């Protein structure tokens, strides 16, 4: 593990850019960017277009390591190059810590939750991540209803996989998303917090994780989890809120920083000039940084 990157993730001021839309969500991400499905005829062309978009983001002067601590990549992006370097090396050289999305998507809903599908190639994927100088990973589950068994299952699965990731020398981001429209959201979050605490308490002193959570209904609910010795940092997802709303809610949570995807890229368009693109990205970065650093 790179100690300098660990220090940056633990104490740096800023947020994490989530650039990890995978195969399923790529057409939607491209459409929002202004690239329609008739502009590519197969998956390779689609992934090249999305890589071009991500390249435009990470090479922009607005994508500044003074504001952006890390970036989460999709497997395809890890294996591609930006300006002649593998993406993770390009980011690390720029001062941005690289993470890799490792999950294979969500299973069918059961007990009010969606567990992760089995990650059958996890070992070899983590070996490749190490070869590509990736610092950490990210994997997402989804909680839709107040169901204690379901929430327990989500957290247990996350920690089980997290321990395999830690064993390979990487720092896992555990992401049990709570749907922002869930009927008993505040109650779900209390149960989730208790289960996360159990999981964290089961780790050895040298087993470090990060958490990526939905912004809690009760402000500062996760404060003591953020202070847990095994937690490097807690980041939050925008989860369907507009950027303005997500930023507003984030400002009320002292220990949390953003890890936004859609809310970061929502004003970026393929047809923008370099100046327009850099300004739109810069405005987004500035506002998300502000919400991550300057608290109410």
Curated annotation (Swiss-Prot):
The UniProt record lists the keyword Cell cycle: no
Signal peptide limits: none
Biological-process GO terms, alphabetical: glycolytic process
InterPro entries xrefs: Aldolase_TIM, FBA_I, FBA_I_Gram+-type
Lyase recorded as keyword: yes
Broadest EC class assigned to this enzyme: lyase
Assigned protein family: Belongs to the class I fructose-bisphosphate aldolase family.
Protein name (record): Fructose-bisphosphate aldolase class 1
Species, as recorded: Staphylococcus aureus (strain MRSA252)
Gene that encodes it: fda
